[in-house]
């Protein structure tokens, strides 16, 4: 992993620090680097963005963990097993949406889909493969997974482009934890490892709710 540092001494004026960050951004852009892992609480992302350097995208990471996020939320709320109801809200049946619905149905029989054609080919496929029927709409759901924008309510888990990622601590096996540098955005680092095929998704877990 390549690490880039910006010199900051006690008393370094803010204008100078911002200029140094911009210079680093330009060097990264000239080198063809477009995605980086930010430090925690990094306040200079806008400056890097102006130079064409952006944070590692974490959307695919969180969408891939959607079913696990739902189980975690249900457990935290004390919803009894067998009584939980989860709604998946989406404008399109993407691969991530389909995988999430299928994963949910393997454990929960009260899964609803708020999406175009919720009783169409996808629902019939699930009935044939799992013997499970999708509910429609999202009324009465204990947890809503929002793959597309909806008017939000308490307890929703936003997973659409532009949404802030869930505030959930991610945990990896010890062999990985020992190699993660301190002071970096863990979600961005894990997303980068996942996208590069270095980290199996099954090894990503959450700290206790």
Predicted region positions:
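Adenosine-phosphate binding glycine-rich loop
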Residues: 6, 158-209
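Structural motif
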Residues: 7-9, 38-41, 89-92, 113-117, ...
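Structural alpha-beta junctions
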Residues: 26-35, 48-57, 104-115, 125-136, ...
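A glycine-rich, Thr/Ser-enriched phosphate-binding loop motif common to dinucleotide/cofactor-binding enzymes
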Residues: 54-72
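Short, well-ordered secondary-structure micro-motifs within conserved domains or adaptor modules
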Residues: 136-168
């Amino acid at each position: 992993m390549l690490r880039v540092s910006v010199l900051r001494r006690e008393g370094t004026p803010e204008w100078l620090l911002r200029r140094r960050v911009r210079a680093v951004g330009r060097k990264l852009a000239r080198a063809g680097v477009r995605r980086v892992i930010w430090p925690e609480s990094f306040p200079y992302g806008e400056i890097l963005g102006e130079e064409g350097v952006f944070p590692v995208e974490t959307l695919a990471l969180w969408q891939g963990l959607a079913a696990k996020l739902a189980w975690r939320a249900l457990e935290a709320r004390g919803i009894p097993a067998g009584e939980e109801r989860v709604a998946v809200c989406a404008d399109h049946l993407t691969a991530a949406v389909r995988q999430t619905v299928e994963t949910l149905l393997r454990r929960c029989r009260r899964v609803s889909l708020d999406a175009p054609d919720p009783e169409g080919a996808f629902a019939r496929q699930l009935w044939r493969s799992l013997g499970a029927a999708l509910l429609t709409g999202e009324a009465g759901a204990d947890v809503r997974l929002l793959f597309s924008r909806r008017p939000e309510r308490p307890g929703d888990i936003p997973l659409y482009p532009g949404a802030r990622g869930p505030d959930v601590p991610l945990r990896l096996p010890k062999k990985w934890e020992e190699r993660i540098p301190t002071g970096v955005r863990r979600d961005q680092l894990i997303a980068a490892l996942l996208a590069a095929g270095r980290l199996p998704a099954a090894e990503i877990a959450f700290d206790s709710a």
